[in-house]
Amino acid sequence: MNIVSTRRMFALRFASVLSALGVTTAISPTRAMASGSPPQENGIRKLNSEGKPGSEKDVIMPVVIHKGLIYVSGQGAHDTRDQKEWTIESHTTNVMDKIKKHVEIGGGTMDTVLQANVFLTKIENWDGMHKVFATYFPHGGPARTTVAVAALPGDSLVEINCIAAVAKK
C-alpha cells in the first residue's frame, strides 16, 4: 500500500469519526478526492505549503480553511539521517515547526490551536514527544489525543495534525 492510499484511507476513516461525533463537512472526502474539485468551493480555501492555492491535482492539501477554522493535515518528520541518530525529540521538533508554519499560513497562531491528534510509532516515546510539544504552547495547549500506531509514512516516529481557529485581527 503506498502513502497516497494510506493517507486516503486515513482521511476517509477520520471523516467517519468526525461524522459520528456530529461534525459535518461541506463536501464529502470521497467526492472531493474523486472529482478534482477546485481549490475553493463552498467557501473552502485549500492552500499548499507556500500559502498559495492548491492545484486541482493535489490529493492532500496541508492547509484547508473553512468557516474560521484551519485544518492542518498530518505532518511527519521524514528524516534522511541514519536511524541511529533519530530521536523522538528531533522528530517532534521537526513536526511542530511544520504545524506552526501551516497554522500561520492559515491565519492562526499556536495560541489558536484548538485540537491536535498525535500518532506515535512507540508509546514509550510519549514523554519525549510531550516535552517538546509543550514548548510550543506556553499559554496552555489544545485538546489532544495521542495514540500509538504500527507505522507512519516515511519512517517518521511521530505524525501530528490539528485544527486551529483563524486569529482575530
Regions found by a protein language model. Give the residues of each.
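Acidic helix-start/capping segments at beta-turn-to-alpha-helix junctions
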Residues: 113-122
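Phosphate/pyrophosphate-binding loops at sites that engage ATP/ADP/AMP, CoA/4′-phosphopantetheine
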Residues: 102-113
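Short, well-ordered amphipathic alpha-helical segments that serve as non-catalytic structural scaffolds
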Residues: 90-104
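N-terminal presequence-like segments and the immediate start of the first folded domain
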Residues: 2-93, 121-169
